[in-house]
C-alpha cells in the first residue's frame, strides 16, 4: 500500500522527531526535509553510535534510502559540509543525497545580523539560535536572497554578493556598529562550497513528484514544532518558517492531495527553548528532575530546555492544525520515578475556563493550567517492548493522553535507541484515525 507520510512536531520542537523519522525510514524509499535550517537538530542513536544532524535527513543512515533537502529549507553550506564529513568518516554514502536548487542559502551576514538583532532586543529578545535563520528567510521574503542555484553559477554569485554584501554592510555599520564584511572573502568561501555541493543539486520538486508517480513511499521529516510555526505558533516567539503539515507540502513542492498520513510527535511531558509563554512550565526540583532525566539540552545550541507537564490544550491544537492521524509519544521513561503526574486539560483565562489555544499572545501569557493528576508507576519502562510490558499506570497515562487529544497513539518511545520502542500500530499502513476510534480503542 502506497503511503506518503508527514512527521510533525506537536509541541515546541525537540519532541524526538529524529528518532521517529529514523524508525519510519526503514519503510521509506525517500526521506524529504521540507523546511527549516541549522536551527533544528536531531539526534539518532544506532548501535551505540550517536549521530547529531541539522540539515541532512535522518534516512541517510539507511543504505537504500534517498534523502532530499527541499526548497523550503535554508542551507548553511559550512554546516552542511561538516555533516558530509561526519557521515563520510563513518562510511555513510552521500550518493543518495539531493539538494533543492531553489533552497535559500545562509550567508555570514545573516548570522551576524541574527546575533546583533537578538542582542539589541534586550528584554524583548526572541531566543533565536543565532544561526542566521530568520534573516535568511527575511531576505527570501524581500526577494533579495541567494539560492543554491546561484551558487552554481560563479558570475551570478559574484554579481549578487557584491551588491548584497554592500547593502548588508550599511546595516551592520549604521544600525549595529559592526565592522564590514569583505565581499571578495565571502565570494571565495562560497565558491569553494559550490564545488562540493554541485553533484547533489537537483530540481527537488520534480524529483519528489517522479518518486510519487513511481509509487515510492516518501517520508517528509518536519523540523521544529507546531507551536513554533510563523503563522500558527506562539508569535512572536516562533521560527521563521511553517513547520506544520501544510508547510511540508509547500517546502517540498507538492500538492496536499499527495499526502496519505500525518504523524505527530510529542514528548510525554513538554519542553521549549528560548523565550515565550509556557503555561505548564515547572520550577524547582521537578523541573530539574525532568531536565536531568530527559537530558534536556538543545542539539543545536546546547541551551537548557524549559520543562513542564504535558499540555493537552496545545496537543489538541496540534491535532487540529496538522490534521494528525496518529501520535508518537516519546520519553515516557523520563516519568518513571514520579509518584504522580499532571496533565493540563484546560486553561483558566481571566476567570473563565478555556479549552482551546488562544492565538493571541497576550491572552496565552495569562493562561493558567487546569490539571488532571494521574498516579505514577515508579518503575523502569526502558526495557518494555509491548503494551503488555508496561506498568498499568503507564498504560493508563497513555490512554488518557490519546483520549484527551482525540487521536490514537501508534508509537511509544522509551529511550534514545531504536530498540527502545513500542510499535502499537503500523503508523504508515495502519488504519486511519476515524477507523481506530470507530473500534473504540485509542491505543488500537
Swiss-Prot record:
EC numbers, comma separated: 6.3.4.4
Compartment(s) of residence: Cytoplasm
Catalytic activity: IMP + L-aspartate + GTP = N(6)-(1,2-dicarboxyethyl)-AMP + GDP + phosphate + 2 H(+)
Alphabetized InterPro entries for the sequence: Adenylosuccin_syn_GTP-bd, Adenylosuccin_syn_Lys_AS, Adenylosuccinate_synth_dom1, Adenylosuccinate_synth_dom2, Adenylosuccinate_synth_dom3, Adenylosuccinate_synthetase, P-loop_NTPase
Amino acids binding IMP: 14-17, 39-42, 129, 143, 224, 239, 303
Pathway assigned in UniProt: Purine metabolism; AMP biosynthesis via de novo pathway; AMP from IMP: step 1/2
Chain residues that bind substrate: 299-305
Predominant location category: cytoplasm
Transmembrane as UniProt keyword: no
Gene Ontology molecular function, alphabetical: adenylosuccinate synthase activity; GTP binding; magnesium ion binding
Cofactor or coenzyme needed: Mg(2+)
One GO CC annotation: cytoplasm
Record: active site: 14 (proton acceptor), 42 (proton donor)
Cofactor annotation remark: Binds 1 Mg(2+) ion per subunit.
Annotated coiled-coil segments of the chain: none
UniProt keywords, alphabetically: Cytoplasm, GTP-binding, Ligase, Magnesium, Metal-binding, Nucleotide-binding, Purine biosynthesis
Keyword Nucleotide-binding among record annotations: yes
Binding site for Mg(2+): 14, 41
Family: Belongs to the adenylosuccinate synthetase family.
Alphabetized NCBIfam families for the sequence: PRK01117.1 (NF002223), purA (TIGR00184)
Role, per record: Plays an important role in the de novo pathway of purine nucleotide biosynthesis. Catalyzes the first committed step in the biosynthesis of AMP from IMP.
HAMAP family named among the record's database cross-references: Adenylosucc_synth
The protein's name: Adenylosuccinate synthetase
Natural source organism: Synechocystis sp. (strain ATCC 27184 / PCC 6803 / Kazusa)
Gene symbol of the encoding locus: purA
Amino acid at each position: 500500500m502506497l503511503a506518503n507520510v508527514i512527521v510533525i512536531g506537536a509541541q515546541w520542537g525537540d519532541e524526538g522527531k529524529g528518532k521517529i523519522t529514523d524508525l519510519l525510514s526503514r519503510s521509506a524509499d525517500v526521506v524529504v526535509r521540507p523546511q527549516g535550517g541549522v536551527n533544528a537538530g536531531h539526534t539518532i542513536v544506532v548501535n551505540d553510535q550517536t549521530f547529531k544532524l541539522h540539515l541532512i535527513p535522518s534516512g541517510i543512515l539507511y543504505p537504500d534510502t534517498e534523502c532530499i533537502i527541499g526548497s523550503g529549507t535554508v542551507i548553511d553550506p559550512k554546516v552542511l559540509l561538516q555533516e558530509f564529513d561526519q557521515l563520510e568518516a563513518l562510511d555513510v554514502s552521500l550518493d543518495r543525497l539531493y539538494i533543492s536548487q531553489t533552497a535559500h542559502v545562509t550567508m555570514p551576514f545573516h548570522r551576524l545580523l541574527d546575533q546583533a538583532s537578538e542582542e539589541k532586543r534586550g528584554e524583548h529578545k526572541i531566543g533565536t539560535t543565532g544561526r542566521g535563520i530568520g534573516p535568511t528567510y527575511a531576505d527570501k521574503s524581500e526577494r533579495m536572497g541567494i539560492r543554491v542555484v546561484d551558487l552554481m553559477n560563479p558570475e551570478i554569485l559574484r554579481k549578487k554578493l557584491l551588491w548584497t554584501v554592500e547593502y548588508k554592510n550599511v546595516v551592520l555599520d549604521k544600525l549595529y556598529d559592526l565592522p564590514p564584511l569583505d565581499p571578495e572573502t565571502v565570494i571565495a568561501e562560497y565558491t569553494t562550497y559550490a564545488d562540493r555541493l554541485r553533484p547533489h543539486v537537483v530540481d527537488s520538486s520534480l524529483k519528489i513528484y517522479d518518486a510519487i508517480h513511481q509509487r515510492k513511499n516518501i517520508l517528509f521529516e518536519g523540523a521544529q514544532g507546531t507551536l513554533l510555526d510563523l503563522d500558527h505558533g506562539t508569535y512572536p516567539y516562533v521560527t521563521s518558517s511553517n513547520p506544520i503539515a501544510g508547510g511540508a507540502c509547500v517546502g517540498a513542492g507538492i500538492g496536499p492531495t499527495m499526502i496519505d498520513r500525518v504523524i505527530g510527535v510529542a514528548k510525554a511531558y513538554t519542553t521549549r527553548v528560548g523565550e515565550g509563554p509556557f503555561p505548564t512550565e515547572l520550577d524547582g526540583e521537578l523541573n530539574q528532575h525532568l531536565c536531568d532525566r530527559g537530558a534536556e539540552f538543545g542539539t543545536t545550541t546546547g541551551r537548557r530546555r524549559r520543562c513542564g507537564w504535558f499540555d493537552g490544550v496545545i496537543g489538541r491544537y496540534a491535532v487540529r492544525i496538522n490534521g494528525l492521524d496518529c501520535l508518537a509519544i516519546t520519553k515516557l521513561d523520563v516519568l518513571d520515578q514520579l509518584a504522580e503526574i499532571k496533565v493540563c486539560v484546560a486553561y483558566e483565562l481571566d476567570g473563565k475556563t478555556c479549552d482551546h489555544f488562544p492565538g493571541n499572545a497576550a491572552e496565552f501569557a495569562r493562561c493558567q493550567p487546569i490539571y488532571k493528576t494521574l498516579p505514577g508507576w515508579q518503575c523502569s519502562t526502558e526495557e518494555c517492548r509491548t503494551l503488555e510490558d508496561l506498568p498499568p499506570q503507564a498504560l493508563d497515562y497513555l490512554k488518557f493522553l490519546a483520549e484527551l487529544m482525540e487521536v490514537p497513539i501508534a508509537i511509544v518511545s522509551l529511550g534514545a535507541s531504536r530498540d527502545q520502542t513500542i510499535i502499537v500500530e503500523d503508523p504508515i499502513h495502519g488504519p486511519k484515525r476515524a477507523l481506530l476510534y470507530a473500534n473504540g480503542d485509542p491505543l488500537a
